[in-house]
Amino acid sequence: MEPVAMRVVILQQDIAWADPAENVRQAEAAIDRRPGADLYVLPEMFTTGFATHPEGVAEKADSETLRWMVRKAAACRAAVAGSLAVEDGGRYYNRLCFVHPDGRVETYDKRHLFTYSGEHRHYTHGTRRVVVTFRGVRILLQVCYALRFPVWSRNRGDYDVALYVASWPVGRIEAWSALLRARAIENQCYVVGVNRVGRDPVAEYSGA
């Protein structure tokens, strides 16, 4: 493919625990401070924090947060991406939403759930690899723990960028950095990794 210039802004948000309205307010302000990007990427479960018990905090599939993402993408003429705890059809998903400026929404449900925290007991794992095409760039959508499973992200010549959103604790941050580089090297692709910052009731996060 011909070289394509794309400006990506990663938003390493300090997520307010289980407070979607406050987190959307923070995300909107962060985007507004950084105009002119092609793609804005928010962390894993950016409206709630890494909620391993989604009951009571998960949003509906067609939530106000998703409608905000659609409005923001249109206003910025850019794509907006981030994962949400979603209830859909009576099941819970850790769902990465990629919203195009024209309002199209493409989604990827987290395949590799973090068993150490019990995520698999409450969420349903995804079954599909998802590659979106945006402004001529093919982007593989991935969520957090999938970074440790190289076969799932194997580049079959079908993507240019692997995009990971995460809530990756500071205690394992060296692995985060090393694995991002490894996925880039072995797949001969660009990698974008977006990790949150701050604290929640479970862990501390340092972004990069």
Where are each of the predicted segments found?
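Active-site beta-strand/loop signature of hydrolases that rely on acidic residues for catalysis
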Residues: 8-11, 23, 31-57, 73, ...
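CN hydrolase (nitrilase-like) catalytic-core segments centered on the catalytic cysteine
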Residues: 63-78, 148-208
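Active-site catalytic loop in hydrolytic enzyme cores
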Residues: 87-157, 170-178, 205
